[in-house]
Amino acid sequence: MPRSPRLPAFEPHTRTWYVSAEDAPPTAVSAPPFEGEFVLDAPSRREMAEDFGHIVHRMPAAVLRPASAEDIVRLVRFANAHGIQVSMRGQAHSPFGQAQVEGGVVIDSRSLHRIHAISTQGAVVDAGVRWSELLRATLAHELTPPVLTGFLELSVGGTLCVGGVGGATYRYGFQADNVLALEVVTGQGERIECSATEHPELFHSVLGGLGQFALITRATLRLQAAPTTSRTYHLTYSDSQRWIEALRLAAEDERFDSLKGKVVPGPRGTLSYLLIASKDFTPPQSPNDPEVLRGLNPDASVAPVIANESYFDWMNQLAPAVARLEKSGAWSQPHPWFDVFLPASQTRTFVDEALASLPLEDIAQAFVLLYPVKRERLGCAFIEVPTEQRLFLFDILRTAAPTPAALQRMMGDNQRLHERALGLGGKKYAIAAIPFTPADWREYFGPDWSLFEQRKARFDPRHILTPGQGIFA
């Protein structure tokens, strides 16, 4: 490629970027022209070397803020020609460097933030759109995505790569299971529109594919009629067995529109177990509370807490807690999150053992959550889950003190708990801060590993995409 003094340049032998070709040696080649920004400055690169976890720090050589999917096509083709690794970063909510790339180029998808269309046929949105932005926009049309994560300030592209779990997953699957079509850029730099009927192999590989086959630039998402109001229910249990049985019963008959469990410290060093659910409606209709709560048998000593709030406020329920964490500084501390899918038959055993092994102060400052999941609702080819039909996603979302010893202890906990979960038939959820070697990934995929390798060879043969997952050596 001819060199232009107005473009950054890359020297392939020393793997060095230069701000312009005028500063580069004769062997350097100019980067392609971009509509957006391609920057090499240290502050931009340092930002891309961080994520919500504050555990892994990989410094990229450059950052692309694309103006369009064509910018990503140009970058990926250039990267293929010169062996440069590339990753796409959304809201950087990954806890373990999954979207980072040492010495490569990070694509900052926040510049791709347009909502193109909203109708009963679906929402067409860029990958960098946040779910909070999308929900506000769809509610103006009395529509909503079927599944929303508890924290809405995540990017659409980011959650579709890993699945995306929320309180309605037990009814509708992952967020990635509610996608109608995608626009992607493969690891070879091909811009392709795909769906269940058009390039289905690519479509089903990318959803939940951990960024290994293509980068999502736009998605068409399923929408459904939205209510105006959510009636919320908080039921308290003093033992884990009745709590898990109640979650299983409520999930089986799908009486709630969202459903999860939460563990909180109780009196005198005990633990309390909450069933947190909602029933959505639009007045003058309203839920029948006795019928909704039938058979759930919470503690008689603690009255259920029942309240009405707007549907948006309920879906955005974590916003106040996040604001407090940001104000206290805890948001910028390390977050060694633990997330694992468990077979329902082993969930109580694992949860009890895990919680008994952790200091009470860890549980007190964490979000400890349990989501029921129905296997038949899940369709992502490469999100591995236990073989039982009834599952739970168990999350221990901790914040570590900003000291090496505290972080090392919690990361050790994660590895120990993961080994125990594997022994009970569990599977890691890929967002977790659990170190994995390529051999660990092969074990994770099991019989699907050969297909995963084949798809990688087809769509990203030079292995330039998303190395931060650590799947390939």
Regions found by a protein language model. Give the residues of each.
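C-terminal structural cap/anchor segments
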Residues: 345-401
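Glycine-rich N-terminal segment of FAD-binding domains in flavoprotein oxidoreductases
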Residues: 18, 43, 52-149, 162-168
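Activity-critical C-terminal alpha-helical subdomain
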Residues: 323-325, 336, 422-473
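Conserved oxyanion/phosphate-binding beta-strand-loop segments in alpha/beta enzyme cores
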Residues: 28-48
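Extended C-terminal subregions enriched in glycine
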Residues: 127, 348, 392, 400-412, ...
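Short glycine/threonine-rich loop-to-helix capping motif typified by GTGT followed
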Residues: 2-3, 14-16, 269-271, 315-328, ...
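Intrinsic disorder at enzyme termini
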Residues: 2-25, 37, 42, 452-473
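C-terminal substrate-binding/cap subdomain adjacent to the FAD-binding core in PCMH-type
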Residues: 6-10, 161, 180-349, 356, ...
